[in-house]
Amino acid sequence: MLDLSIIAYLLIAICLIALIFGALLGYFSVKLKVEADPIVDQIDAILPQSQCGQCGYPGCKPYAEAIANGDQITKCVPGGQPLVVKIAELMGVDVPSMDNTAVPEVKVALIHEDMCIGCTKCIQACPVDAIIGTNKAMHTVVADLCTGCELCVAPCPTNCIEMIKVKQNPRSWNWQFNPDLIIPIVNTTELQKKMIVGSAKGEIQND
């Protein structure tokens, strides 16, 4: 059997080695730390975080990094034109004109409920919780929440999910507006009151 003093020395040596390695790791983590670009975090914060990949990047953070490096700010389909305006304001650039930009076809997922087996795989895949349902029960897509990312299609074992085009109506139409052309609202009632009071004062002075 080993002497207790030897065991104690071994434990002390192991603790000292662990402390030394811990100190070295802490030192190098600070010394070799790579500072992240703050603009990337700011862009990433306003992206929808759906991680849908429709922009051509594997997630929102890589797309934020690409924007910071000069890529187009119009590639986020779920964010739409309002997001483009926010990113343009953050980057201090002009809002890109949408006249010559192809508008992506808006689609949402549709579950054929007669084929659904209630496996919940599409629910787990949906990044925006747009699918409702429980285990071994039919699932349904909440169209207003669906971003059309198609991430729910591949996991479905019965191929009961179809991407359908959204019919354009005043509610679903992608209203692409230029914020510089917004006309401010004027309170005409107050304006009329001031004109009446002003004309009344003029009449009194003339009398």
From Swiss-Prot:
Binds 3 [4Fe-4S] clusters. Residues 107-136, 137-166 form the 4Fe-4S ferredoxin-type domain. Residues 35-93 form the 4Fe-4S domain. Keywords: 4Fe-4S, Cell inner membrane, Cell membrane, Electron transport, Iron, Iron-sulfur, Membrane, Metal-binding, Repeat, Translocase, Transport. [4Fe-4S] cluster 1 binds at C52, C55, C60, C76. One of its GO terms (biological process) is electron transport chain. InterPro entries: 4Fe-4S_dom, 4Fe4S_Fe-S-bd, 4Fe4S_Fe_S_CS, Elect_transpt_cplx_RnfB/RsxB, RnfB/RsxB_Proteobac, RnfB_subfamily. One of its GO terms (molecular function) is electron transfer activity. Its cofactor is [4Fe-4S] cluster. GO terms for cellular component: plasma membrane. [4Fe-4S] cluster 2 binds at C116, C119, C122, C156. It is found in: Cell inner membrane. Residues 1-29 are annotated as: Hydrophobic. Its EC number is 7.-.-.-. SUPFAM superfamilies: 4Fe-4S ferredoxins. [4Fe-4S] cluster 3 binds at C126, C146, C149, C152. The complex is composed of six subunits: RnfA, RnfB, RnfC, RnfD, RnfE and RnfG. Part of a membrane-bound complex that couples electron transfer with translocation of ions across the membrane. Belongs to the 4Fe4S bacterial-type ferredoxin family. RnfB subfamily. HAMAP family: RsxB_RnfB (MF_00463). This is Ion-translocating oxidoreductase complex subunit B. It comes from Haemophilus ducreyi (strain 35000HP / ATCC 700724). The lineage of its organism: Bacteria, Pseudomonadati, Pseudomonadota, Gammaproteobacteria, Pasteurellales. The gene is rnfB.
